[in-house]
């Protein structure tokens, strides 16, 4: 690399609009502003650890699919994940990374690691619905990652041209509903839905959502071995798992050694009168029906206790109750497209869905708060 090229490499990062030189970050909290908020302090502390060569890191799961847990990851695991993503998207020195995920969880943490490992310019903003509201209008980026809620807000705010100047965009942390997937088709920048978890140091597979060849299946990244257990749930083994076999609760259709279709979580199966109903299958039909009625309501499906059936299939919708006529139209569409035992027996309207700190839908909390 020439001297002129080296001069273009980053020696600082931007956090909420303020510049922090790496030499100062390595000495954090010395030489730091006294008015940092808690989030900024925690981000800088992780950056300090990474830049100073720490070998172990404690990561926290979001709790969206169970009780939040702490997971110890080695530097080698995080480096392997960053290297795999960097190679796949050809991320290189001097390119620009926007980090707007919560950096207290693996999605945001791995964005930081990728930027450090690939020597990319790093702009970090505190998570909010429209991250572009926090960066200058003239700022452009090459790579970023959003949760679906953010991408929905960004498109609604008219920021598609800014997205289209990027090399690629990741979307993860929650399912992408049909309405958002339709809106993504307007983008020329490649958009990928990620599959992964804290225990795999973020994603191990990607699904292209737009462009000439969108696909309903996930493609496993090079060097990752996948299989299935006796339940049909995905197993994962690779350097990011310390070569230990991890068994997930995600039911998949494994098409070959590198491709799978995600069917739903084993723990989201509703046992209604002895008939097992996969909640995510009903959700897909529900989302399509809402789209046909011109509704942008967020929704999900889960089981609720029922004296006769044990569990009944229930559809939870965000916002005020729909007019009776629309509810009848929705139920009619569901009745046409779902099996007898799959049809939601009730529509439950919740003013606002609960989310975790990492931006994921918190189903359990939402169900508990529902009327």
Q: What are these language model-derived features?
A:
Residues 74-80, 96-153:
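AMP-binding/adenylate-forming
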């Amino acid at each position: 690399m020439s001297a002129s090229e080296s001069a273009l490499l980053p020696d600082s990062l931007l956090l909420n609009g303020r510049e922090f030189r790496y030499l100062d970050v390595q000495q954090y909290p010395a030489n730091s502003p006294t008015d940092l908020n808690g989030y900024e302090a925690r981000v800088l502390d992780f950056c300090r650890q990474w830049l100073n060569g720490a070998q172990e890191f404690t990561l926290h799961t979001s709790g969206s699919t169970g009780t939040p847990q702490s997971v110890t990851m080695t530097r080698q695991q995080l480096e392997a994940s960053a290297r795999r993503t960097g190679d796949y998207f050809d991320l290189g020195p001097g390119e620009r990374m926007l980090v707007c995920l919560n950096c207290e969880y693996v999605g945001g943490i791995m964005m930081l690691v990728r930027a450090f490992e690939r020597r990319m310019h790093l702009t970090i903003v505190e998570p909010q619905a429209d991250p572009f509201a926090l960066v200058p209008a003239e700022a452009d980026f090459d790579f970023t990652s959003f949760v679906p809620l953010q991408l929905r807000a960004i498109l609604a705010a008219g920021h598609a041209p800014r997205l289209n100047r990027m090399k690629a965009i990741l979307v993860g942390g929650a399912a992408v509903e049909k309405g958002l997937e339709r809106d993504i088709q307007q983008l020329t920048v490649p958009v990928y839905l990620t599959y992964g978890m804290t225990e795999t140091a973020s994603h191990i597979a990607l699904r292209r959502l737009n462009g000439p060849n969108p696909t309903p299946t996930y493609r496993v990244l090079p060097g990752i071995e996948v299989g299935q257990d006796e339940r049909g749930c995905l197993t994962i083994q690779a350097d990011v798992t310390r070569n230990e076999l991890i068994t997930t609760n995600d039911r998949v259709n494994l098409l070959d050694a590198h491709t799978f279709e995600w069917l739903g979580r084993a723990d989201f199966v509703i046992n209604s009168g002895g008939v097992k109903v996969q909640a995510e299958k009903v959700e897909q039909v529900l989302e399509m029906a809402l789209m046909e009625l011109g509704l942008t309501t967020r929704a999900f499906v889960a089981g609720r206790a029922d004296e006769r059936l044990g569990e009944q299939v229930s559809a939870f919708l965000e916002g005020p109750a729909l007019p009776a006529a629309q509810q009848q139209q929705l139920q009619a569409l569901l009745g046409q497209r779902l099996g007898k035992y799959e049809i939601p027996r009730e529509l439950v309207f919740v003013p606002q869905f609960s989310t975790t700190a990492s931006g994921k839908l918190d189903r359990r909390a939402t169900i508990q708060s529902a009327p």
